[in-house]
Amino acid sequence: MRFNMTTTLFSPAEFEQALRDKGRYYHIHHPYHIMMNDGHATKQQIQGWVANRFYYQVNIPLKDAAIMANCPDPATRRKWVQRILDHDGQHDDHGGIEAWLRLGEAVGLDRETILSQKMVLPSVRFAVDAYVNFARRACWQEAACSSLTELFAPAIHQSRLDTWPTHYPWIDAEGYAYFRGRLSQANRDVEHGLELALEYCNTVDRQQRMLNILQFKLDILWTILDGMSMAYVLERAPYHTVTQEAVWHQKGLLG
């Protein structure tokens, strides 16, 4: 195992490339995603992914609100608030959370089941909660730049649009609206996120820390799929050696 560190200050172009190079660790390369995009996933595996990723979706606005709460710059907040509106919706746009619920219905899940979060695995909950808590506790620039996995997001959304309709004809096509919407939104968000990162990371320490923060976010996305792989591929859900029931803790412990 090697840990690559440098004592050299990157130019803005070099630093941007270093950030983009992290794409080799994006969860599009996880075996679970490869399985889904290659058409080898079962209905249960698709449903499990949608139900668990819903927990990620509903927490993104909380993450973004935490960033805004720590940010003293009005101009940045005016731009950043659009991310919350993208997910929560406004006026005639129902938002990404509603679009994800419709994806859930398109793959055969009951809306109430998704909203109950009873299918959310502990490992997924822990990973997502770690991300939100980081956004609450880190300085706003670092928390904002943890979102730079959006650099790689358009490719993963496009891959689903390109492959899923063929591989999974049983999925209602209306469910793909979320992926189509995120294609343009992610590109817009990347421009702002990169601008912040290149402005803030003007020392070796800041650049290296930001690369580590981006890796932290990549670790979260990968870990989410590791948990799903245990439950839905290896059929080793939590406590599988003693029960087939979903006995793990549910939402609302602190609410």
Swiss-Prot record:
The pathway it acts in is: Cofactor biosynthesis; pyrroloquinoline quinone biosynthesis
Its EC number is 1.3.3.11
Extract the Pfam families matched here.
Answer: TENA_THI-4
Q: What reactions does this protein catalyze?
A: 6-(2-amino-2-carboxyethyl)-7,8-dioxo-1,2,3,4,7,8-hexahydroquinoline-2,4-dicarboxylate + 3 O2 = pyrroloquinoline quinone + 2 H2O2 + 2 H2O + H(+)
Any one Gene Ontology MF annotation carried by this entry is: pyrroloquinoline-quinone synthase activity
- Keyword Oxidoreductase appears in the UniProt entry: yes
Per UniProt, the keywords (alphabetical) are: Oxidoreductase, PQQ biosynthesis
HAMAP family xref list:
PQQ_syn_PqqC (MF_00654)
- Name the protein family: Belongs to the PqqC family.
What this chain does, per the entry, is described as: Ring cyclization and eight-electron oxidation of 3a-(2-amino-2-carboxyethyl)-4,5-dioxo-4,5,6,7,8,9-hexahydroquinoline-7,9-dicarboxylic-acid to PQQ.
Q: Per its record, how is this protein called by name?
A: Pyrroloquinoline-quinone synthase
List the source organism. Answer: Acinetobacter baylyi (strain ATCC 33305 / BD413 / ADP1)
